[in-house]
Amino acid sequence: MPKGGIPDRFTFAPMLAVDIGNTHTVVGLFSDGTLQRKWRLTTRPAATSDEIEMRVRQLMDVGRFPVSRLRAAAIATVVPALDRSWHKGLERVVPTGDVRSLNHRNCGIALDYANPVQIGPDRLANALGLESKGISDAVVIDLGTATTFDVVRGGTYLGGAIAPGIETGMLALVGRTARLPQVAIEVPERATGRTTEAALHSGLLLGHIGMMEHLVARIRLEEGIPNAKVIATGGWSVVLRGLTRIVDAYCPDLTLEGLDWFVRTRPVSEM
């Protein structure tokens, strides 16, 4: 049996992984242990379970995947109001009714955190994604609406840091200043912007990279993990790819992979 006592016949069973963020919801279809399809939806806090069921069935039709083959689904949400509606909607789609919401109680990870109930399920999923890759010392930088840093040492989740995301920073500037325009965020040619737009690009992107590099260096020093791998994930990780040497690997689907690993390695009795 694999870790967690899951019978072999369920190890690579088709499943859905749902990462519900503040801005977007990403649905991943796993089969044979690999991500087959991925869809990015707008997060709608008022969505009902009926609407969610209908949308998921539509996605399965588009992906030409019969829902009758699904064996499980896992949810990680930072929008608590959506957990119940997604859970109920997916229960009607997955024939086995095996739908699990990831949290600090059932993640199966050692947590060195003052108040584990406050840990976002997406951050736990990232830690599980590391476990699936056999990485025990790491800093995961998840670049989304917020930019989060998740620290794992010896397989134990320690916490991390939370900062405004790149786009969130821009919207805050635009909303609180009279003269700064909203711009399409682009990679700047140089740090010194010769126009307001270029200066914004520099501050938003290169400034963000500077924050990343400083925090990673400090985390490695404070936690005594100088060789910790740095893994970047999240929607904005694609934009920053190649702009910093601090990142060892870009894994845009790490959160989904962690949810897949969660289903495949944690017994239902722990849910």
Model region roles, listed by residue range:
Residues M1-N106:
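N-terminal glycine/serine-rich phosphate-binding loop of ATP-dependent small-molecule kinases
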Residues P2, D8-A17, T43, A47, ...:
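ATP-binding/phosphotransfer module of carbohydrate and carboxylate kinases, centering on a glycine-rich
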Residues K3, R9-F10, C107-A138, D260-P267:
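Conserved phosphate-binding catalytic cores of ATP/NTP-utilizing and phosphoryl-transfer enzymes
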Residues F10-Q36, L130, S136-Y157, L173, ...:
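Gly/Thr-rich phosphate-binding beta-strand-loop-beta motif of the actin/hexokinase/Hsp70
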Residues T23, R105, T145, W236, ...:
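A generic "binding-loop/recognition-motif" signal
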Residues R64-I119, G154-G159, G165-I166, R194-L205, ...:
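Short beta-strand-loop/turn "lid" adjacent to the catalytic site in phosphate-handling enzymes
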Residues R64-S68, K133-I135, E223-I225:
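Glycine-rich phosphate-binding loop signature in dinucleotide/nucleotide-binding domains
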Residues T148-E189:
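Anionic-ligand binding region
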